């Protein structure tokens, strides 16, 4: 297992406390660049943009926020920000127009009319996690809400036929959108075989045909029914042809177990680590279209594992309150892979441009042999590129004996 050390990071100011699912990455203001959205226990919704340490946008919600999400929950072809509190208050924000405003004015007008939600509604309380996705294949997104009592409910945004604005609609509980018991419900989205490119995370219209995987975790199939389990689906396999065959999903447990499975419940690999894993994400760190599994422990130890079970790890230097991973626009004016850590010292750290040339370990000589520039240097030095022993000796002398050539 290799260890990594990422150094490109920014520090954001955050003085509140938050629940693990009250943080997400996505295009909150529909400018094609991703932002970081955080909800705290005092009811504040904060949106961070670029490398600015202060929130670009601040909104006030009712109660303590337990989960936030970004997506086209109203099926309008653009993203909305959703924040749900423990008391059951659902808040809907349209931040599209906000990107045109000056960030300084946002800080000054904290309690103006513009700071209020576009829509609020009370739904059953004790929410734990939310998901915006098309769960019934009708091309419209639904809001799936998981509760602390193991109940899952699905809602759809409905509007009157003569509605003039988004705020005139409401969430309606689906007739068959209620599940109860020790179940894990995962959304596996297959790539569209028509050849359309997959959009960045939280972009409207990015999901193709999909299927549900429901695992009933009976006592005989889990190590300990009291151990917290986290699941993530829709893990991209790279090419659209491969991804359309079956989806991948991963799960991790607080006792340090990591597993990758396909939609037929076939186990692809299992990894056991000596850390308490509390967060599970997916992220393409190699740029090949395949998403790696990213798991984070309370002590900051972070594991990145590919589909072939190649593992690298990164140690964040503080204990972690919350964690997420995805695409974020920090610098350079474009989205890049990033890891986000919320510490207990009133800071949020974003490691941006989290990229690797490859996941698996490799031989240096094999890598050099594929580079034409290296062969040109060998020829200039009078070393036969086909003489592997001579090449090996030359490289060893340069690396370990510091000899001049």
Where are these regions (language model features)?
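Beta-propeller-forming repeat regions
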Residues: 1-405
């Amino acid at each position: 297992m290799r260890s990594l050390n990422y150094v490109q990071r920014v520090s954001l100011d955050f003085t509140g406390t938050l629940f693990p699912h009250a943080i997400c990455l996505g295009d909150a203001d529909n400018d094609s660049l991703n932002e970081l959205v955080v909800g705290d226990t005092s009811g504040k919704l904060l949106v961070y943009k670029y490398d600015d340490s202060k929130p670009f946008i601040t909104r006030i919600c009712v109660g303590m926020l337990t989960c936030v999400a970004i997506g086209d929950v109203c099926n309008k072809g653009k993203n909305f920000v959703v924040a749900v509190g423990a008391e059951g208050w659902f808040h809907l924000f349209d931040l599209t127009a906000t990107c045109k405003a000056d960030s300084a004015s946002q800080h000054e007008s904290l309690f103006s009319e513009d700071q209020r939600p576009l829509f609020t509604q009370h739904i059953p309380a004790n929410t734990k996690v939310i998901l915006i996705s098309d769960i019934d294949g009708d091309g419209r997104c639904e809001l799936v809400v998981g509760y602390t009592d193991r109940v899952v409910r699905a809602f759809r945004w409905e509007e009157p036929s003569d509605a003039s604005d988004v705020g005139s609609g409401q969430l309606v509980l689906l007739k068959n959108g209620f599940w109860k018991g020790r179940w894990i419900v995962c959304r596996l989205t297959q790539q569209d075989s028509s050849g359309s490119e997959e959009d960045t995370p939280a972009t409207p219209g990015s999901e193709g045909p999909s299927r549900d995987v429901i695992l009933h975790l009976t006592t005989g199939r889990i190590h300990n029914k009291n151990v917290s389990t986290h699941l993530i689906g829709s893990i991209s396999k790279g090419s659209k042809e491969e991804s359309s065959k079956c989806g991948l999903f991963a799960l991790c447990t607080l006792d340090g177990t990591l597993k990758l499975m396909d939609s037929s419940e076939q186990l692809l690999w299992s990894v056991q680590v000596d850390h308490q894993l509390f967060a599970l994400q997916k992220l393409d760190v190699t740029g090949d279209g395949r998403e790696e599994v990213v798991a984070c422990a309370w002590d900051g130890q972070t594991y990145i594992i590919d589909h072939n079970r190649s593992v690298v790890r990164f140690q964040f230097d503080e204990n972690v309150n919350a964690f997420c991973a995805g695409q974020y626009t920090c610098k350079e004016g474009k989205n890049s892979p990033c890891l986000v850590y919320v510490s207990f010292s009133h800071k949020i750290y974003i490691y941006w441009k989290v990229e690797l040339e490859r996941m698996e370990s490799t031989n240096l000589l094999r890598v050099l042999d594929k580079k034409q520039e290296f062969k040109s240097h060998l020829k200039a030095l009078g070393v036969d590129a086909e003489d592997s022993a001579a090449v090996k000796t030359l490289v060893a002398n340069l690396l370990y004996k510091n000899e001049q050539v």
